[in-house]
Amino acid sequence: AGEDHGRGPYVQADLAYAYEHITHDYPEPTGTKKDKISTVSDYFRNIRTHSIHPRVSVGYDFGGWRIAADYARYRKWNNNKYSVNIKELLRNDNANSGGSHLNIKTRKTEHRENGTFHAASSLGLSAVYDFDTGSRFKPYIGMRVAYGHVRHQVRSVQQETIAVTTYPQNAASSVTTNAPIRKLPHHESRSISSLGFGAVAGVGIDITPNLTLDAGYRYHNWGRLENTRFKTHEASLGVRYRF
């Protein structure tokens, strides 16, 4: 609100720094959902990342209370994983007139995954109360409800290679391998759109009766994508203009 406590519509533009927390909950071994298999990858177990994004709002100032609708898009989080597992399948010693040698047969399994988790968009509605301090500085608090869209995608490929390593008694070892056996790629894509709830707080600094500098914080719980929870903490700096 301005110095004259005027009322009227306003627009606001912010640049927000978002701390994003993704938590993956696994069923207890003895729980009722112990046999439920989640299709959400283990990628998203306790991920902490961040992004910077713009946010725009339109609202109405009632001279103390404000109501505003806001919209924001977030950066996509992605990661690659590569793992190798080597398992011994067979071991034997061979002895003949020419000497002895050891054969070891192993299976090498290579697994590669590409995963993304994206808070694609958030459309929110906030109710905010500005505290009149008798100065240009006006702290505020409020509540927010938002319709958010979250996407998750994983693509994985796996191949196996069988190798036989021979260790002669008096010579260098040698390795014989077959052609890699590739399994069919696995791809999964999930999305959810749901209502989430959060809180907002901050301080407005009146530059002119119609222009306010806004430094704010907001917390938002986006809800669940199966058993994956997604939350954001955001710090923002912006300007608000009341008509």
UniProtKB/Swiss-Prot annotation:
It is found in: Cell outer membrane. Residues 1 form the signal peptide. The keyword Signal applies. GO terms for molecular function: porin activity. It comes from the Bacteria. Belongs to the opacity porin family. This is Opacity protein opA59. It comes from Neisseria gonorrhoeae.
